Design a protein with these regions (language model features):
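N-terminal accessory scaffold of Fe(II)-dependent oxygenases
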Residues: 1-196
Length: 196
């Protein structure tokens, strides 16, 4: 049902019981700081530019419990390619016992990552492209963008709230020009006259 009703139709959906069996307490800032605070993480601005590499603990200290909105966020992926970087594989290995493959997501017959009908893959056990954890203080954001590989993103909100804007792929030309996407907070009507 999930594939036919939502994925194939490019129809966004919020699944409210997708994490009911997960130990979400293990994904709170206090737990992550206590268990992984010494880990080095990549810190980005809203245009996806790497700003700094620092410890997770330092990021929390600088961006949580502040009155001013956070300007930067952590994007911490599992290893995508063979380069020396600050990957989150150890984090996901440690956290794997606290979450599971969402019940509504297929285990087989996948395009990205490829998985034949007779085989299965689990998000918790297998490599998935761009599997990562994103952490941000209140007010941090990413700009409007198109996910790589024409992928269908699966976001699991563990803590706090998130405002998200989704646009149908048919609207891509209205919000993108010369490789640049419209800034939703400051729409340039001259550059993006069709965007609404």
């Amino acid at each position: 049902e999930f594939v036919n009703e939502y994925l194939i139709k490019n129809q966004p959906v919020i699944v409210t019981d997708g994490m009911k069996d997960w130990d979400r307490e293990k994904f709170t800032p206090s737990y992550l700081k206590k268990e992984f605070g010494d880990s080095l993480v990549q810190i980005y601005n809203d245009l996806f530019d790497l700003q700094n590499v620092d410890t997770l603990e330092t990021y929390f200290e600088n961006n949580f419990d502040n009155d001013a909105p956070a300007k930067e966020y952590i994007r911490w992926y599992t290893q995508l390619k063979e380069v020396d970087f600050f990957w989150s594989d150890d984090l996901f290995m440690e956290l794997s016992k606290f979450w599971n493959h969402p019940y509504f997501v297929p285990h087989n017959d996948l395009s990205v990552p490829f998985c034949e009908k007779e085989k299965t893959r689990s998000i918790t056990e297998n490599q998935y492209p761009y599997k990562g954890i994103f952490i941000s203080g209140k007010g941090a954001r990413t700009r409007l963008h198109k996910d790589p590989f024409n992928s269908n993103a699966l976001l699991c909100q563990f803590y706090g709230t998130k405002k998200i804007y989704l646009y149908n792929p048919s609207k891509e030309n209205a919000g993108m020009k010369d490789g640049e996407f419209v800034d939703l907070k400051n729409v340039d009507k001259e550059k993006f006259p069709l965007f609404s």
